[in-house]
Curated annotation (Swiss-Prot):
GO terms for molecular function: 3'-5'-DNA exonuclease activity; DNA binding; DNA-directed DNA polymerase activity; nucleotide binding. It holds the Pfam family DNA_pol_B_exo1. It catalyses: DNA(n) + a 2'-deoxyribonucleoside 5'-triphosphate = DNA(n+1) + diphosphate. SMART domains: POLBc. This is DNA polymerase 120R. Belongs to the DNA polymerase type-B family. GO terms for biological process: base-excision repair, gap-filling; DNA replication proofreading; nucleotide-excision repair, DNA gap filling; viral DNA genome replication. It comes from the Viruses. It is an enzyme of class 2 (transferase). Its EC number is 2.7.7.7.
Amino acid sequence: MDKPSTKIVNDYTHFYAYSWHVDEESVDETFIRVYGLDEANENVCVSVNGFRQFVWVELPSFIDWSLSHNVDRVVRYFEQTWPNVGVQFKMYRKLYGANLKQSRSNGEYVHKKFPFLQCSSMSWKMLKFTLPTALKTPQRIMGLGSIKFRVHGQDACPRLQLTSKYNLPTAGWIQFKGIEILDQDVKFSQSCREFMVDLSDKNWGKPSTMICRSDKTTVPRPLILSFDLEVNSEEVVTMPKATKPGDVVFQISCIFNRLGGVENEVERYLLSLGNPTEQIVGATILRYSTEKKLLMGFRDLVNEKNPNVITGYNIFNFDIPYLMDRTVYKSIFVEWAQQGFAKNRPGIPREIRWSSSAYKNQEFKYLDCEGRLYIDLLPVVQRDFKLNDYKLKTVSTFFIGETKDDLDPTSIFRCYREGTRDDSPKASHFMSICGKYCMQDSMLVYKLFEKLNVWYGLSEMAVVCNVPMITLFTKGQQIKVYSQLYKYCLAAKIIPEKDGYIVAENERYVGAHVFTPKPGLYENVIPLDFSSLYPSLMIAYNIDYSTCAFDASIPDQLCHIMEWEDHIGCAHDPKVVEKERLTQLINTLKNKEEVSRMRKERSEITKSLSKNVMCEKRKYRFLKSTTEDGRFKGVLPTIVQNMLDARKETRAEMGRLKKRLGTAVGEEATHLQTQIAILNQRQLAYKVSANSMYGITGVKAGMLPFMPVAMSITFMGRTNIARVAQLLQTQYQGELVYGDTDSNYVSFNHKNMSMSELWDYAIRVADEISQQFPPPIKLEFEEAIYSKFLILTKKRYLYQTALRDGTIKKEIGKRGVVLNRRDNSGFIRKIYQNMVDSIFNHVAGEGRDLKSVVLDVVTADICALFNHQFPVDDFVITKSTGNYGDLQPENFVNEKGVPRAMLGQYNVPCLTSQVREEERIETEEQEQNWYLDKLPAHIQLLEKIRRRGQMKNEGGRLEYVIVETNSLKDKQSTKIETLPYYTKNRGILKLDYLYYLHRCINPLDQILKVVFDLDDFVKRQYKAREAKKKVTLELGELFRPNFIIEKSQLQLVRARADEVYRLVYGTAADCRAQLGELGPDWCVRAKFEYVPLVDDPYRYFQQKYGATGSLKTKFDFEGRDIRLNNQPESKLVSTLKREFK
């Protein structure tokens, strides 16, 4: 008897959803497939069919929709015009604006509702494209006339609508009833338990009972694949390129294990060409005879093991794009890309571009395979941690104390060449060394994935933001906020209108207020902070889209009124006023020193002035909402309040679990640790989401822009922090040392107080001031007294913390100073730290005075510098590198009408025709060099590295040192070199100690000025050593022997009609004559200057690179002709350059 192909499941089936796929291939119906794990960690695929997606069509208010025949007419028109669209007349609130009306019965104000048609369809294409496009044209409806409609809600994809309507977690436990598909031939997926839920089938009851949120809390254990590639480069000194024949993917390491798995559960595989040995590699070896078979073997292994998560390090920028490009080059992409749970369906290549404050600029590729969740660990680490560099070796050493073998790219390429040469033990050894290194990369990534709780962090953030986990990588912040807001609006019957507010040109919000500090070294400073300032302001003053009262008929007593003036860069701006005052004094004073000081001060003001001038009066009103009367509570305040409450509950639960953990052992302890880790990631997700909620309102071109909210929140933030500062000074006789955004640093009259008394006083002050603000605004004492507080300028300070019992912590906190900046060398940080330590650790009355101690420390460090007592690593500088567009400029005209150019993300001067003529720039190479000179020095170094054929480090941070040249006037771009290059040539190159000392002048002299009122101490030290260096260079120049080396030219020329090359050489005149003899059909492809050590460069070149040569690189020679022999022209040019430089 044949087995049934399906089985009806009447009881709820539970599964943990982690991946969502919207299938829009069908024109008539959109399908949603959800992939997850059941309670036994088996793979599950749930196909949700019959879900009617929806949009809202706004109806004009000038028609009386209380008349049923008007409603019937418009509904009938839509049903007849679009038969596949379901239409319902609804009255909803609008998101934008406080739309109120007075009740006729009691005169109270109530929310006004507006007429909409809710249009639903099985086809998302119909609702997203067909219907909105048609409705752009006014529709003539019998009895109603010509009506122009507006469509809202099409920004919400079917997945967002489904999860919002039925309150489903995007990463969490879901329960459903439906049909289980048993027949493998009928199944859509492979290696999954497969179910179908048809929401349109009335026999199952209401759709909300067919699929809904589950109350299970079991922690799933997805199968994780961590992988890494090793790729050859046939050029040896250049980065691999997928379209080059010899740039072969020759090894792929794969680590499989369940989340939370132990070491002995790990499955290790190395897919490799050649013949590596398992003993050295420490993994099961899967050997392949060709690269194509290896690539397909990777696909087969993925499909066999069926991992839920595929992770690696920098895989979005290298590994996955390279595999995709390589399989395209090998003409196997479609077959290779069939790596998802869906049978015989290739993954879709996705190219992503977006940016945010956390992730910065993101540009990457990945393969969108159903059911596979791709997670790149590099952007996760970059977002959450500040490190000097983000190389895997650095990150793994920092977090898990493990490292990997040192194997640079050149050695990897050699392992490939030697390892694939033959089947000898030597070849096997080379391939094994590389395989071991490759396996180490994958294992470190897996351990980091576990250590950093990446799964918990992403899943909890996905749930809070109502987006799938992959969206956290592929989309920016706006979609996260929009998804939360959409879900709330759907439940509250509020329409999130598209283009509901048009941002005016003069609407820009001013940032937080920063008080001008009183620089100095203070004792026992109290830090007082607003807790979650912007979310609290949003709640306290009910600042929201739906509460902004533009309607003048709404009385002021119902509203919070916010009125202020914005003066930025205009005549009323205090900075501009001060600049004008300084200008007048400069024109009248005759004292040169005073004039110089004022010019410097004026220059600083000019730099700080905003280019965007604002001179505006603002007034906004927002409906009040109280605990007793919450009728008018806004959407954003409600969402934020819910998140803050949920965070509070989560943290309380963490506290209870930590208490239990103190006495737990064995499996119970492990379970509690896991629960605490999950809850910690959850409370962080609530915190991050609550703090970023208001940001979407201030993005002019965003999904839901509303500048009045952003402007009013920042205004109230400035107002409240200023009010606290006033209260601290007037009511509590405190001295305001500094204030910034949400914090005040105040010094009370503490000489007669013990530390515990001062502590208690700070708590009382914070509580009393909090009572003067509406809840939930709360001023908090940070539970730390800064026993010493060194304030330098705005946003730059250092402090040492004391506890209630007077215990002083050794660590020195810092903000905005040299110690916080990763682009400063270790030497600068050391000398700065030594100075700071000497100030903070000095005890008055013990030994010498503070000034003598500090100056001795600084002087000793400077002497040690020029005595070579610091290691080389202390002079390494790291800076992040950006895309510079391969030196291909995109010209534009800026707001001032000045021609500029963009080189990738760098804004540089434009090469105008006038400059081109003046500087005689004729060739493309000269143009590129001109633009290169306009880029930052470390970006110029990046291009220098590329031209050398070396590979820049992963993670976008470049390490370099500054070396001496023969001139003190040379630009930094001339002196800058990579650390490996310097190390290799340190017998010739010397570090430029003067440069490093010069970098210390401002930060060190700033502290000395603030603490001791001492001017230019380090600067004078620098000037003395600079003078000495200048004399040394002049003496060296005076006694330097002069060598006259005559150089000849060598030119590579090519026939225009044929790919035939020749060499012409000799003096410049000789080359011109030879080229003239060849005729007009020959053109110059490359020029070199060389010392003529050989009589006939052509014969030397032919003997070395001809058919009988021993080298791998060969060209065809016939007479004086040279042919490429299937190699690129660039190969011939680089070979000539190397031989005759």
